[in-house]
Amino acid sequence: MNKQLKEKLALLPDQPGCYLMKDRQKTVIYVGKAKVLKNRVRSYFTGSHDAKTQRLVSEIEDFEYIVTSSNLEALILEMNLIKKYDPKYNVMLKDDKTYPFIKITHERHPRLIVTRNVKKDKGRYFGPYPNVQAARETKKLLDRLYPLRKCSKLPDRVCLYYHLGQCLAPCVKDISEETNREIVEDITRFLKGGHNEIKKELEAKMAEAAEKLEFERAKEFRDQLAHIESTMEKQKMTMNDLLDRDVFAYAYDKGWMCVQVFFIRQGKLIERDVSMFPMYQEADEEFLTFIGQFYSKNNHFLPKEILVPDSVDRDMITELLETAVHQPKKGPKKELLLLAHKNAKIALREKFSLIERDEERSIGAAERLGEALNIYTPHRIEAFDNSNIQGTNPVSAMIVFIDGKPNKKEYRKYKIKTVTGPDDYGSMREVVRRRYTRVLRENLPLPDLIIIDGGKGQINAARDVLENELGLDVPVAGLAKDDKHRTSNLLIGDPLEPVFLERNSQEFYLLQRIQDEVHRFAISFHRQIRGKSVFQSVLDDIPGIGEKRKKMLLKHFGSVKKMKEASLDDIKKAGVPAAAAQLLFEKLKK
């Protein structure tokens, strides 16, 4: 901890507020709130913490704080600061998690539409629905039952919907406001859970039509009833009061929190939302931050009622959201809370199981690979592969695996500079020399294991440069392949000896992933270089096309094939003078 941090920690007040943690570049990396700033901020720098909190603390170089007059004010300020700074260690809910609604537009002749955007435009919104298909099915049913206008702009003649009986044709007929209002009220009644009443009305109309021997009309009513049954059957009833509500519950363990949200609309459980994130505050405070962001950042529909666990501050949530907040003690609402909590615990348990499985696949594999090679665990592995075709455009590539996982930010590509022709040994010497000269010069981390995707000659070439030129003692292993060019085993030691691994072991799979990845990376780089080389050769010796114009053409057309397909005018439009364009066009057509 630096001196400035110690001095600022000593001056923290015994008041509520927000704190902003900053890194070396003065970037805000975490925003938190506290009932007592002094206690909360100091806690980061004292005692033991789990790995993720240690990682956060290790990056803190400075902090600032803002005192507030209440805990609620601190919560609101925290939400605003998170929006402003977008800190990398804060929970940021995704913007794209929006649900579809059915909307009755506020127009002279209203329309029924499916939308994801809830606006304050006097339209009536119903939902959300679990997915757009559910919303469209319900709208399709309503279109059959209620003939509202369908066209966004009124045409000058009737459309197909009029002939299907699904539109009153306000484009050519004088439809009264009273008629529109009655239809809107019927749709509203249906969407608010009154479909059973509407079913009874349709059954009565069907019976009346049958008595009058109007069998076609009776069949229409029967079909409408069947559509209501099939559409509404898909939506399970959970509450009898038909109220819109969101049910929140959370579980936490090992420094992680899972929040489950059940969406209840018109008494139906239509969908749930699952969020999983690391904790840096007390559980109840993490939850308050989450629920504040949930409605503000995602623009979620705010229902009439929210159910939350007993462990959180109900009054603060009520003030924050301005809706009814309840903490039920028994009955169906309590059962919903318990069900959401049970799901949160299950989701956490599954996450930890996946983490353990992933660690077994990555860290565990690296540990056992070290045991098989009789070296320390190779937390950092660097692998090399050469690529050329008969010595042309020779390149090499290096990839990095850390704790059994690829770290693509540290991948490197090399154009071979000192070797001509197909000389894999010389190429390997050059690349290893360039890589580890730079590592030593810039004090970069050394690998625990170097893997060469090549035979004994390349392994010995790499080891010779490391030991005799650079004075480095890093284990070097080679990937031996079978006759189908698949990973067979490892070569290591002096002299080189094969190390056999079980083909179904995680350490063997790790080697396969490394070999496939370094080969892919090298090949893709070689293709890129070769493509540029072919492109350049086509453009050689054409007056008026120098290096600058070659690059421009490469960028414009992308490949020789596309340039050959181009017309003379296309080449001119790419910025080539007429005379040079004519020469190039003729050369391409030969």
Swiss-Prot record:
Database matches in SMART domains: GIYc
A GO cellular-component term linked to this record: cytoplasm
A biological process from GO: nucleotide-excision repair
Pfam families attached to this UniProt entry: GIY-YIG (PF01541), HHH_5 (PF14520), UVR (PF02151), UvrC_RNaseH (PF22920), UvrC_RNaseH_dom (PF08459)
UniProt domain GIY-YIG: residue ranges: 14-91
Xref: PROSITE patterns: GIY_YIG, UVR, UVRC
Record SUPFAM superfamilies: C-terminal UvrC-binding domain of UvrB, GIY-YIG endonuclease, RuvA domain 2-like
Cysteine pairings via disulfide bonds: none
Subcellular location: Cytoplasm
UniProt xrefs under InterPro entries: GIY-YIG_endonuc, GIY-YIG_endonuc_sf, GIY-YIG_UvrC_Cho, RuvA_2-like, UVR_dom, UVR_dom_sf, UvrABC_protein_C, UvrC
Subunit structure, as described in the record: Interacts with UvrB in an incision complex.
Family affiliation: Belongs to the UvrC family.
Entry protein name: UvrABC system protein C
UniProt source species: Bacillus velezensis (strain DSM 23117 / BGSC 10A6 / LMG 26770 / FZB42) (Bacillus amyloliquefaciens subsp. plantarum)
Gene designation: uvrC
